[in-house]
Amino acid sequence: MTLTASSSSRAVTNSPVVVALDYHNRDAALAFVDKIDPRDCRLKVGKEMFTLFGPQFVRELQQRGFDIFLDLKFHDIPNTAAHAVAAAADLGVWMVNVHASGGARMMTAAREALVPFGKDAPLLIAVTVLTSMEASDLADLGVTLSPADYAERLAALTQKCGLDGVVCSAQEAVRFKQVFGQEFKLVTPGIRPQGSEAGDQRRIMTPEQALAAGVDYMVIGRPVTQSVDPAQTLKAINASLQRSA
């Protein structure tokens, strides 16, 4: 992977891999992070770690050279969501997300909150349908559309509001690239190398399949974090992706 210049002290990688840091122990998380190279991936910090260890933990990861996807899925009244997104930008994260189901006014307010940050603003992504959800789960909420159709409706709203892209399942990526264009970024969890267990993600795909489907950033968790040699696992994934490109 080629290390390129950044507008900040954070390293920039051209790898599409984002490793999910799902730890409840700060030292264990940092011990893992110190085994891998920021040129090989970005890192995702979610609700558990951010609640436990706060912004300072994000700064520690940034000081090690990593770009951070702050995966807090903001979903609130427009003013509150906008202030939260601006706070994430102040923290210097690379990507932040909101729930598309928060609606157009909320997403527009979040986007407008990033205007003062200019080129230093993080990517603003909306969550469509959680990858753990199936049609029966949506039906329980009164949604009669299929997960794919509902995700597409929310993605269309997201693009209309001017956000950078959406979180979606890999199965939706081909259709989304056709409908929303190449510049609309697709971020996909549930990506697992061949031979990995599915875990709690229902709709999964391998990194190579995700790349072919049009996924821009693929979130990979336990197959890397629980690997005996995570650095080598990352290098193998990236090498395979380069061969598939």
Curated annotation (Swiss-Prot):
Write down the CDD domains for this protein, in alphabetical order. Answer: OMP_decarboxylase_like
Q: Which GO terms describe its biological process?
A: 'de novo' pyrimidine nucleobase biosynthetic process; 'de novo' UMP biosynthetic process
Q: Which Pfam families match?
A: OMPdecase (PF00215)
Catalytic residues, per the record, are K73
Provide the E.C. number(s) assigned to this enzyme.
4.1.1.23
Q: Which GO terms describe its cellular component?
A: cytosol
Residues bound to substrate are: 22, 44, 71-80, 131, 192, 201, 221-222
Catalytic activity as recorded in UniProt: orotidine 5'-phosphate + H(+) = UMP + CO2
Q: Would the keyword Lyase be found if you checked this record's keyword annotation? A: yes
InterPro entries from the xrefs?
Aldolase_TIM, OMPdecase, OMPdecase_AS, OMPdecase_bac, OMPdeCOase_dom, RibuloseP-bd_barrel
| Protein's UniProt keywords contain Lyase | yes
Q: What domain of life?
A: Bacteria
Coiled-coil spans in chain? none
Q: In which pathway does it act?
A: Pyrimidine metabolism; UMP biosynthesis via de novo pathway; UMP from orotate: step 2/2
Q: Which UniProt keywords apply?
A: Decarboxylase, Lyase, Pyrimidine biosynthesis
Q: What GO annotations for molecular function exist for this entry?
A: orotidine-5'-phosphate decarboxylase activity
Q: How does it assemble?
A: Homodimer.
Write down the NCBIfam families for this protein, in alphabetical order. PRK00230.1 (NF001273), pyrF (TIGR01740)
Q: Which family does it belong to?
A: Belongs to the OMP decarboxylase family. Type 1 subfamily.
Q: What does this protein do?
A: Catalyzes the decarboxylation of orotidine 5'-monophosphate (OMP) to uridine 5'-monophosphate (UMP).
Protein's name in the database = Orotidine 5'-phosphate decarboxylase
Q: Which organism is it from?
A: Escherichia coli O157:H7
Species lineage, top-down? Bacteria, Pseudomonadati, Pseudomonadota, Gammaproteobacteria, Enterobacterales
